[in-house]
């Protein structure tokens, strides 16, 4: 079950190749080093998106700008803790060495990294990249755009199912500081302990702003699995707003400020203090229906 979600946290490195445009090789240097991920490319633009209403320009950024900004991050090395090859007892030392509020995007003086870092990620023991037919998905998307047929959430869902591109992720945005580092540590431990599968966090940008933590699931059409991941995130101590986005939107370059006025997030989760054993209320954004 972890394969698709694991593929969603695979980054691209310099010179990476393969028939699939988002596939690349690994160049790990141990848990404390820099690693280029296996499988498909990581999400472009996640640290900049998901906060506003769909459509148009927002904060001066178009969907194309968001994609281009983070594509550069995808090309840089990542800091990775790989539970498949590294003892869980080493996680705390790794977290202490690379707190996301201190790791900088371009390796600023005084930061733990001297070189650029695209993402910080934790792979669970079930990590096994499998992104589906991304090339076929993108070709079908190009054909759809030139066909004149309507582009709706339903058509994108069907494209994803047809090409087996089913992974998705819960996103949470936090300002740099203790709360971010504490939240990331909780998520990382949940991944290593098996409650969650794969996760990543963006490094601190030079211009500041919130950083994003992404927690992946195998299948965005599996509502129960998506809700179980939400519960595990809440159990890890996360209380901020969460939004859930299928990876098909990212592969096709569809962000919040897109020309089709599509909302790329399916679900919204808000922490609920008391009254609910699961600790959150989850809203189906497309249908405006509470699921929990």
Curated annotation (Swiss-Prot):
Listed Low complexity bias regions: 1-11
Modified residues (Omega-N-methylarginine): 29
GO terms assigned for molecular function: RNA binding
Start and end residues of each stretch annotated as Disordered: 1-60
Domain of life: Eukaryota
Gene behind this protein: C11orf68
Alphabetical list of InterPro entries matching this protein: Bles03, TIF_eIF4e-like
Coiled-coil residues: none
Entry protein name: UPF0696 protein C11orf68
A Pfam family annotated for this UniProt entry: Bles03
Ranges annotated as biased composition (Basic and acidic residues): 35-44
Similarity remark: Belongs to the UPF0696 family.
Annotated keywords: Methylation
């Amino acid at each position: 079950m972890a394969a698709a979600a694991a593929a969603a946290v695979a980054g691209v490195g310099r010179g990476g190749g393969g028939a699939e445009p988002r596939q690349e090789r690994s160049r790990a240097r141990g848990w404390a080093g820099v690693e280029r991920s296996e499988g498909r490319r990581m999400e472009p633009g996640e640290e900049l998106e998901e906060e506003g209403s769909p459509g148009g320009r927002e904060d001066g950024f178009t969907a194309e700008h968001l994609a281009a900004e983070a594509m550069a991050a995808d090309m840089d090395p990542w800091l990775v803790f790989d539970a498949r090859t590294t003892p869980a007892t080493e996680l705390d030392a790794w977290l202490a060495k690379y707190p996301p509020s201190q790791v900088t995007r371009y390796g600023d003086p005084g930061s733990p990294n001297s070189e650029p870092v695209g993402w910080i990620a934790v792979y669970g023991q079930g990590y096994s990249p499998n992104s589906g037919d991304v090339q076929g998905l993108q070709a079908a998307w190009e054909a759809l755009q030139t066909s004149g047929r309507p582009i709706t959430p339903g058509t994108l869902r069907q494209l994803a199912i047809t090409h087996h591109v089913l992974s998705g992720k819960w996103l949470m945005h936090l300002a740099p500081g203790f709360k971010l580092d504490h939240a990331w540590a909780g998520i990382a431990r949940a991944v290593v302990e098996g409650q969650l599968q794969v996760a990543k966090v963006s490094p601190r940008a030079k211009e500041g702003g919130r950083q994003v933590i992404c927690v992946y699931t195998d299948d965005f059409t599996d509502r129960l699995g998506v809700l179980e991941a939400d519960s595990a995130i809440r159990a890890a101590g996360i209380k901020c707003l969460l939004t859930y986005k299928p990876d098909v939107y990212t592969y096709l370059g569809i962000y919040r400020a897109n020309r089709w006025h599509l909302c790329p997030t399916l679900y919204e989760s808000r922490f609920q203090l008391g009254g609910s054993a699961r600790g959150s209320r989850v809203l189906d954004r497309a249908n405006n229906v509470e699921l929990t």
